[in-house]
Curated annotation (Swiss-Prot):
It comes from the Bacteria. InterPro entries: NADH_UbQ_OxRdtase_su1/FPO, NADH_UbQ_OxRdtase_su1_CS. The keyword Acyltransferase does not apply. NDH-1 is composed of 14 different subunits. Subunits NuoA, H, J, K, L, M, N constitute the membrane sector of the complex. This is NADH-quinone oxidoreductase subunit H. It comes from Chelativorans sp. (strain BNC1). The gene is nuoH. Signal peptide: none annotated. Belongs to the complex I subunit 1 family.
Amino acid sequence: MESFVTLYVLPGLLILLKSVALIVILLVGVAYILYADRKIWAAVQLRRGPNVVGPWGLFQAFADLFKFVFKEPVIPSGANKGVFLLAPVVAAGLALAAWAVIPVSEGWAIANINVGILYVFAIASLEVYGVIMAGWASNSKYPFLGALRSAAQMVSYEVSIGFVIVTVLLAVGSLNLTDIVLSQRDGLGTMVGLPNSFLDWHWLALFPMFIIFFISALAETNRPPFDLVEAESELVAGHMIEYSSTPFLLFFLGEYVAIVLMCALTTILFLGGWLPPFDFAPFTWVPGVVWFVLKLVAVFFMFALVKSFVPRYRYDQLMRLGWKVFLPISLFMVVATAAFLKFTGLV
């Protein structure tokens, strides 16, 4: 009995505590990411943005949270009630589950598994089911159209993201997210006399794939200019049009958690994760988790800027970009990376 408690119960409780702590930190982080998103968009449009609730509007997201929670959920009369209520739980739950393997610093992950990037990719692929369930269960044409668009869009851009991951796998030789970060200590920067610097990170050596991954991440998370799933001018709110109260909040939460997840993946795969930009003081004095958060925020800032000034694509343009531009380029980069590693004897 004592060995059972030591081997299973205590590790299980530790994982549970880590998971709860991660979810709380994520929810608070998403609240301020949303605040930053609205502030950046307002600044581009020469507006003030949220500025009433709390100092400088810092508590606006929490006010919105209480507003949604205390509203009455309305379920359409023709909707499939069970699936209708399950869909937002699936969307938010999968977005949170993907964070289990994300290392914010060395050793700072709930599960440091050897197929970490594959796990994240699999979970991200499943997130479309929440949208499809919502579109079908709402028994309305606008949510259903939004759900169909979402399925086609996510499948199209997951192909390109998959090839980006294959390229990184070839360059690193591991699917472990911690190994991917640590492999970025040596690269082009070492060759030019700046070892362990930002020039060693994959963004430079795999620059075309960095751009493809960033743009595909926008499409994967339904961010502008690829927000055709919930295009306000056509579908109002897409698959979320019939939702209100807490179910709507869960969809909204899942969407922003997925956005932050993609920013974290961009940081890990291409921007050195928690590694400092230079391997000397004072840069090395800063904890790795701080560097990780700063890089994540910088990537999100780019997400927000794209939302602010890039117009929405047409649906045919979105599909053409994914299948006729990104797919051939990413496939060529996989072959080119493999050939380079083979002929230089690096594998």
